[in-house]
Amino acid sequence: MNKKTIPIKQVTSWSFSRYSTYKQCPLKLKLSAIDHIREPGNEAMVRGDAIHKLAEKYIKGEGRSLPPELKLFADEFKKLRAQYKKKINGMVVEDNWAFTKDWSETQWDNWAECVVRIKIDCAHHQDDETLIITDWKTGKFRPEMNEEYVEQLELYALAALLLHEHIQQVKPRLAYLDLGITYPEAGAELVFTRTDIPKLKKLWKKRTKAMLNDKQFAPRPNDKCRFCFYRNSNKAAGGGQCKY
């Protein structure tokens, strides 16, 4: 009697979070995204989520006063609130963008065809042809993560250019609410135009190829293992799935 072959599960869709997790450790992605062994939240994550909700509510006109957690960007938030009230085409707050394999727009819950999912904190117009995408950050700015920051901004830019045909250029950025700084800083913005679309598509195809074709998900020991929920020494807390 032939034994039944159990197909090897692979990653069939991705987000920037999944991509960055895979770069750090393929096994970590498998355990979280395929095996669905969820890591418990922590205080920093809970605080970050709460502040994101404060930003969303204020921009959307809920409440009169600016929450103190947002005070370092007070002028920015007041302008965003006013622009949101005008319902300008292209401005979104806490939005979900989804694409198929060939980068056609689709629905987030199109489980059969959606391959790329992107969460947007805020996107607003600088002028009629320029869109600024902002990702609100809490906590520290880490210069050593420059490569990852740029990759994230490139993904935002590609998605925005594909979704909004009237937009000619996109300026994506990270805004650190606890520090009052943006990355890139004012005057040194990353600017993407419609001519960048083919290049960005090729970049992301190359970057995600290994992840989407992986059938082994080998662990990748690194300096972050000691903090990983799945580390061998964390069995008592529900981890321990990794030998390292």
What is each model feature region?
Residues 9, 13-14, 100, 104-105, ...:
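Metal-dependent nuclease catalytic regions and adjoining charged, substrate-binding loops involved
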Residues 5-10, 27-39, 133-137, 204-212:
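Short amphipathic alpha-helical segments and their helix-coil junctions
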Residues 50, 151-159:
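Short amphipathic alpha-helical face segments that pack within enzyme cores
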